[in-house]
């Protein structure tokens, strides 16, 4: 074990900038120029979603010890919850219970726990005495901010450092973020964290939110960042966050060993520590982290793997609660394409809190509309082969530009398809319907009718609705669906008329 992390050897053998010549800085200690960046490990808390927090008592102690020796600035040891004490799990009923897993030599490491106001009785929280956790990170939704901040206030009065961690900051408007920051300033906690709950953050989102918060949050409140791997961007975003070099602001980045956390996982702390060592003069001991991964985390991942997965990318793409993706995955008969289309149809008011009944309604409707339309497509493909198509939409410009449209038809002799109506002033070769209400109002059918499978009633050609409806804002628009069909059938050129209100984008 000569090459392993040795608790009896707490010093690095390399002198770093800021250290006295020949006297290296001990792990966990930072010189004045380095004090504004902290690395927080959340393996025992966020990683616990993988194994129901059942790490085992000795494993918990060893993970905490390894992270402490590695020089991690903040080690989160689990949740404060209203649960019966189980020494093998990192969910604690009292601070007294968790003291048994903390090392005797704390090495200036801050130890933290996380709490939700409605899952933990604040009256059970003992006053801070310096021998338990130092920091309590409190999460709250946009609908219970007042209750969350009141919990923060009470914990702060008991002597703890507090971090306010609002859930899904991507769901806040700019005005909402500014209002929240104003309330946090009144409380004046130790830290405020930008939490990308659904893993939906892009670079421009990070830039916007960091700018809003940094320019309005009191400068002596540390700013944290908690990311997820839904879109495989957590390491890139964390680097960007640090490279902003926020003036006069302490910052904290959350990460976990091997990125352990609910699929797809979190930012890998070993990667982040290495990046900080190379670029910010830090001296985290990567070996201690790698030992903990090998001894404790890899055996868990063999039983319950995590990592990038398309359904969780899609849940992030639409900024949805992750349980929607898991719910549709559990059906067992949906492709990633199917899940994409289902997630795209979730109403805005249903996105943040998972609604199983609502999800089942979407699933049932989706299944009802799914058909095999290969024969209909093959027949249409033959009829459309080599033809230019004129798509008519029911806009007022059909009347105001009637002469121009007639001239185009006479000159180009296109095959004419009307979208969701039968034109009165033009002769259509086909009518394409995606709306049941429009279809039911047909008094006569002067041309063959193409209808999608969501419509009840007889049509000459029935086409699968789900394969034509796109997973984007106008994906279920009849004209867009018609163009989708034409592209699928190999039509190379189409003209539009009556598409009032549409632009080239």
Predicted stretch roles:
Residues 31-36, 383-386:
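Extreme N-terminus of proteins, especially the signal/transit-peptide cleavage junction
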Residues 20-33:
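Short, Lys/Arg-enriched N-terminal segments with co-localized hydrophobic residues
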Residues 17-21, 272:
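Short Gly/Ser/Thr- and charged-rich N-terminal loops/segments
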């Amino acid at each position: 074990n000569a090459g392993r992390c040795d608790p009896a050897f707490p010093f690095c053998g390399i002198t770093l900038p800021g250290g006295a010549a020949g006297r290296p800085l001990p792990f966990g200690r930072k010189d004045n120029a380095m004090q504004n960046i902290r690395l927080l490990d959340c393996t025992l808390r966020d990683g616990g979603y993988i194994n129901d927090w059942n790490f085992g008592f000795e494993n918990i102690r060893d993970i905490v010890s390894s992270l402490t020796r590695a020089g991690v600035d903040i080690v989160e040891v689990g949740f404060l919850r209203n649960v019966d004490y189980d020494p093998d799990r990192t969910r604690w009923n009292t601070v007294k219970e968790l003291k048994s897993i903390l090392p005797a030599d704390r090495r200036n490491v801050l130890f933290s726990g996380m709490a939700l106001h409605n899952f933990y009785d604040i009256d059970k929280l003992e006053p801070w005495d310096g021998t338990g956790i130092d920091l309590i990170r409190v999460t709250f939704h946009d609908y219970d901010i007042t209750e969350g901040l009141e919990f923060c206030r009470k914990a702060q009065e008991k002597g703890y450092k507090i971090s306010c961690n609002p859930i899904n900051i991507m769901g806040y408007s700019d005005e909402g973020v500014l209002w929240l920051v104003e309330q946090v300033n009144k409380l004046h906690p130790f830290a405020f964290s930008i939490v990308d709950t659904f893993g939906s953050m892009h670079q421009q989102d990070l830039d916007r939110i960091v700018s809003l918060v940094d320019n309005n949050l009191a400068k002596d409140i540390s700013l944290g960042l908690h990311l997820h791997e839904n879109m495989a961007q957590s390491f890139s975003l964390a680097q960007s966050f640090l490279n902003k070099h926020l003036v006069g602001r302490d910052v904290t980045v959350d990460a976990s060993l091997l990125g352990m956390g609910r699929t797809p996982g979190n930012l890998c702390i070993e990667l982040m520590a290495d990046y900080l060592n190379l670029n910010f003069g830090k001296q985290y001991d990567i070996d201690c982290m790698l030992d903990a991964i090998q001894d404790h985390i890899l055996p868990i991942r063999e039983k319950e793997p995590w990592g990038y997965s398309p359904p969780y990318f899609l849940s992030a793409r639409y900024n949805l609660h992750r349980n929607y993706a898991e719910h549709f995955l559990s059906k067992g008969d949906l492709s990633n394409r199917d899940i994409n289309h289902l997630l795209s149809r979730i109403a805005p008011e249903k996105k943040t809190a998972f609604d199983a009944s609502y999800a089942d309604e979407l699933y049932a409707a989706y299944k009802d509309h799914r058909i095999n339309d290969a024969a209909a497509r093959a027949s249409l493909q033959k009829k459309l082969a080599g033809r230019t198509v004129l798509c008519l939409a029911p806009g007022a410009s059909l009347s105001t530009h009637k002469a121009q449209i007639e001239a185009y038809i006479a000159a180009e002799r296109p095959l004419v398809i009307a979208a969701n109506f039968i034109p009165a002033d033009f002769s259509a070769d086909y009518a394409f319907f995606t709306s049941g209400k429009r279809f039911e109002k047909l008094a006569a059918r002067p041309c063959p009718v193409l209808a999608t499978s969501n419509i009840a009633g007889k049509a000459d050609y029935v086409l699968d609705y789900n394969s034509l409806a796109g997973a984007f804002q106008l994906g279920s628009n009849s004209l867009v669906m018609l163009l989708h069909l034409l592209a699928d059938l190999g039509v190379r050129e189409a003209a539009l008329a009556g598409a009032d209100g549409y632009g080239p984008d």
